[in-house]
Amino acid sequence: MRVLAAMSGGVDSAVAAARAAEAGHDVTGIHLALSRNPQSYRSGARGCCTIEDSNDARRAADVIGIPFYVWDLSDRFHEDVVEDFMAEYAAGRTPNPCLRCNEKIKFAAVLDRALGLGFDAVATGHYARLVAGADGLVEMHRAVDHGKDQSYVLGVLDQGQLRHSLFPLGGSTKDEVRREAAERGLLVADKPDSHDICFIADGDNAGWLREKLGDRAPHHEGTIVDDDTGEVLGRHEGSYGFTIGQRKGLRIGRPAPDGRPRFVLDIEPVSGTVTVGPHERLAVHRLRGIRPRWCGTVPDRLSGTVQLRAHGEEHRAVLVRDGDEVDIELLEPAYGIAPGQAAVLYDGSRVVGSATISATDRVAAR
């Protein structure tokens, strides 16, 4: 089988490419150039967009003994991921750019191009497992290493994409992968994992948004108000710098009368008003999801679990499909859930699909 191995310059994608080659596949490595200005990223930045990362990927391909190329998808990435990220925050929502990248870039633009060039599959270093289902469908399950499981950010993939995907690391732990990399002589064996949003080099999301959005945001400045009294507690430089559940960086002039910390409860991008209050008012019992993406069979109703953050806990939930939208009832409350986040649905370890949260039903305890 002809396999295109996406190599970020990190240890996971390098070992995934090596395993694909060792399995007898005809493997070609590629590095995705996603930044329009990679020189702006400092050496050692914990992302995958630096020139250093590209060089690390090339050296790994040389060690493995596979051809290697760089594909420039920077314009497509900027349009589909970066611009979407800015627009979502400007609208008061909290997007996950990693899911967007998987949906629009790695398993769409890259996969489509790979298939057009005669490749049979794309291999990545994601931690997830693919197994053959009894109904002939390809099922995606959580990885063996639950601490590194990345099935959440892959919950946007459908059958057409899963059938042409390989995740060679799904049955391994991270420690095993690092040991194997060292044994194979891969210089990235001890390279730190990337955690930050790859196109925000210093990790300062609010500062980056302020610089990039500028006057494009509906309200550059606004007020921070108390949920109980409506009193103005402070001002801010842009509602796009906040997310639901945020506690730090509010810069409120005085503490609450009861001394408890305040959290962001609501963001109104049109007026620029950010409402804050106690933690218990973040409790969410019901979600509305739009743009569902199904990994296989489309359920009308499902009792399973839902994950609401990339490394968040699972919540027992009941899903009811309503046309092109879904209603998700949480059997226990979740806290700090924001519109724009992804709700990824599971039946045991199997990924059922995902939806973008459009609304939440908060039960305000007063």
Curated annotation (Swiss-Prot):
Protein name: tRNA-specific 2-thiouridylase MnmA
List of catalytic residues: C101 (nucleophile), C198 (cysteine persulfide intermediate)
Reaction catalyzed: S-sulfanyl-L-cysteinyl-[protein] + uridine(34) in tRNA + AH2 + ATP = 2-thiouridine(34) in tRNA + L-cysteinyl-[protein] + A + AMP + diphosphate + H(+)
InterPro entries (alphabetical): MnmA-like, MnmA-like_C, MnmA-like_central, MnmA-like_central_sf, Rossmann-like_a/b/a_fold
Residues that coordinate or bind ATP: A6, M7, S8, G9, G10, V11, D12, S13, L32, G125
Start and end residues of each stretch annotated as Interaction with tRNA: 148-150
E.C. code: 2.8.1.13
Subcellular localization(s) per the UniProt record: Cytoplasm
One Gene Ontology biological process: tRNA wobble position uridine thiolation
